[in-house]
Amino acid sequence: MKVAFHLILLAALPLPLFAANAKPEIERPAASPQAVAALHTVRQIPEACTRIEGRFTGDAAAPYDMQLVRISAQCQARAAFLDSTKVTPSEASGWKLNEVVRIPSASCNTQQALIEVWRKPAGQQVALDGQGQNRVYLEDAKTQAAAGRLAALPAYSAVLRMEGASCR
């Protein structure tokens, strides 16, 4: 009985390791090194009308600051951007690793900010027309809204981590 328990325990150990190494949907090389206090765009997510901005602070306790900025007041979001501390994105909970953005520090070549952008699909198939476009017709949308059959929105979230040794 003890042997079977230990075998099951050993077989389950690698599972979290594989989950942590999820392959992102979008792969890009690392961004160009950024100077301390230089505000830069990390990623734009037009579906959520959101731009992720960041900057290295020079503070050892919080070396990188990441902010979410609304792209435009007129932008109508087709996706939600959720706080990663509230939703804890992971593949186990239905999220997909969309992209991993690496931003090296110009003043400390051993340190980089790593931003994981996660996407949670709405879970529905989108019907495309003959031109390959998703069309939303006002009268159909009003009818669906009146019937309480609004489509779920996809969601995005971003997780910030620091990699490498601090230079101070």
Feature names for model-found ranges:
Residues 21-168:
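Ser/Thr-rich low-complexity repeats and stalk/linker segments
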Residues 10-19:
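Hydrophobic h-region of N-terminal signal peptides that target proteins for export
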